[in-house]
Swiss-Prot record:
Naturally occurring in which organism (per UniProt): Bordetella petrii (strain ATCC BAA-461 / DSM 12804 / CCUG 43448)
Role according to the record: This is one of the proteins that binds to the 5S RNA in the ribosome where it forms part of the central protuberance.
Family: Belongs to the bacterial ribosomal protein bL25 family. CTC subfamily.
Molecular-function annotations in GO: 5S rRNA binding; structural constituent of ribosome
GO BP annotation list: translation
Stated name of the protein: Large ribosomal subunit protein bL25
Gene: rplY
Record-linked PANTHER family: RIBOSOMAL PROTEIN L25/GLN-TRNA SYNTHETASE, ANTI-CODON-BINDING DOMAIN-CONTAINING PROTEIN, RIBOSOMAL PROTEIN L25_GLN-TRNA SYNTHETASE, ANTI-CODON-BINDING DOMAIN-CONTAINING PROTEIN
Amino acid sequence: MKFNATARSVQGSSASRRLRRAGRVPAIVYGGSAAPLNIELDHNEIYHALRKEEFHASILQMQLDGKEEAVLLRSVQWHAYKPQVLHVDFQRVDANQALHTKVPLHFINGENSPAVKLSSAIISHVVTELEITCLPAALPQYIEVDLGNLLGGGSVHLSDVKLPKGVTYVAHGSDANPVLASALVKGGGAAAADEGGDAAAAETPAA
């Protein structure tokens, strides 16, 4: 995706407020061999771009003063109660340097899984994005998680998903294989209790 930016020389909170009143958004781009650069964006353009998933998880082409530069969205500051973008951070992308970022998960075939069709289970998406590292050329817009074989009461782990070539999951702590989705069977607790009661009754000898 492409977006337009303009270099800005005036900094400070007062200057930022003036920009926002004029329908502009203060931003910064950093990283790589160049110094951090303060830029400004059109609010309407960046607001609508931020509503698209791909803007958050793909290499972006920034059009700045007649030149194009590859960047990655790093953070967005929103107004506390208004639909207003206050500030945006971008990172320059070096084709030969690995990225460390998050990508969304797309869950498919859940409605066709045995968990739903046979057990009427409720599927919970435990994790909705993964932290990964990869070279820019290998960065996926999303990672697909197929739930087609999920059974009632079962779960899908990261090890059940084939990551795109060149993509490595960044684990936190000891959880190298997190649960991505699980299937909760309705009334499972009650059914289990009934089964336990039946089993206990069966083991009790008749008087």
